[in-house]
Amino acid sequence: MSSTPVDAHQPLQAVHADARPWETLRWPGQWSKMLFHPRPERPTEPNAGLVRYEPGSHHPFHKHDFAQVWYILEGEFRIGEATYGPGTMLFYPDPHFEPPLSTATGGLMLFVQYQGPDTGGRPIYDGRFNMTARKPVEQENVER
């Protein structure tokens, strides 16, 4: 049983995916609906939502100091040297290197990115998931 007083507990929050628009993600052919994301008043809230991949979309090798879990809902993805399909869950502990990803089929994934328990690194929302325009891939910061 928790020793936290009942009035200190936070209420459940629920968001339907249809309540959010698809937003421009930093990598070519990728779009996101982050249903939850860190905000000034809730800095430890995870990035959690959907990422849609167009056929042929990809991203390069890069690294993060936060942790994340992906669940493949649709499509096939080449991630590093392996191919994964629907029903596969992937876990990236913190810190981690994220290998190149590509998809010929396109697809859909559930993403949950959260503060790394080892590094304390927090997921980044602004300027990555809610972009008005993409930069060329070679101008993206692959160090975060």
PLM regions: where:
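Conserved metal-binding segment of the jelly-roll/cupin
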Residues: 54, 83-105, 112-115
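Conserved short histidine dyad/triad with adjacent acidic residue
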Residues: 33-38, 45-63, 82, 93-97
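Short, well-ordered beta-strand segments in beta-rich or mixed alpha/beta enzyme
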Residues: 49-53, 73-75, 108-112
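Double-stranded beta-helix
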Residues: 99, 103-144
